[in-house]
Curated annotation (Swiss-Prot):
Function description: Involved in the maturation of the nickel-dependent guanidine hydrolase GdmH. Required for nickel insertion into the metal center of GdmH. Seems to be required only for GdmH activation and not for activity.
Keywords for the protein's UniProt record, in alphabetical order: Metal-binding, Nickel, Zinc
Lineage, uppermost ranks: Bacteria, Bacillati, Cyanobacteriota, Cyanophyceae, Synechococcales
Pfam families, alphabetized: HypA
Name under which the protein is recorded: Guanidine hydrolase-activating protein A
Consequence of gene disruption: Disruption of the gene has no effect on hydrogenase activity or urease activity.
Binding of Zn(2+), residues: C74, C77, C91, C94
Gene responsible for this protein: ghaA
GO MF annotation list: nickel cation binding; zinc ion binding
UniProt cross-references to HAMAP family, sorted A to Z: HypA_HybF (MF_00213)
Classification via PROSITE patterns: HYPA
GO biological process terms on file: protein maturation; protein modification process
Residues that coordinate or bind Ni(2+): H2, E3, E41
Length: 120
């Protein structure tokens, strides 16, 4: 389950950003782009995030995962296509092997929603 390690890396990245803020914001949502070709299970990622953020600066923050489809480009046919995730990734028209992936390998933070905490 590599989602646990990915979640640790995600938290460390957000921690670095958080530590650079002069006034520490309350993080409410983290929007993440996850490509289909990363083989990341969104449910496992959500679970790992919930477990690892309890009693931290991210406690209560929501992880919003946007699935990015796998899109490849066939240089022979000069067209984009969306291969099915599985064993066969060749062009559906000419059967050339997939060698130019246009999207689907993303695993990145799209944006962080937050608001400034008001002093008590």
């Amino acid at each position: 389950m590599h989602e646990t390690d990915m979640t640790k890396a995600l938290i460390m990245t957000i921690q670095d950003w958080f530590d650079q803020q002069v006034e520490k914001p309350q993080i409410t949502k983290i929007h993440l782009l996850v490509g289909q070709f990363t083989c990341v299970e969104p449910v496992s990622l959500q679970f790992a995030f919930e477990v690892q953020t309890k009693q931290t600066f991210l406690n209560g923050a929501e992880l919003v995962i946007k699935d990015v489809p796998l899109v490849a480009y066939c240089h022979t046919c000069q067209t984009e296509y969306s291969p099915e995730i599985g064993l066969q990734y060749s062009c559906p028209t000419c059967r050339s092997p997939m060698d130019d992936i246009r999207s689907g390998r993303e695993l990145k933070i799209d944006r962080i929603e937050h608001h400034q905490c008001t002093p008590a």
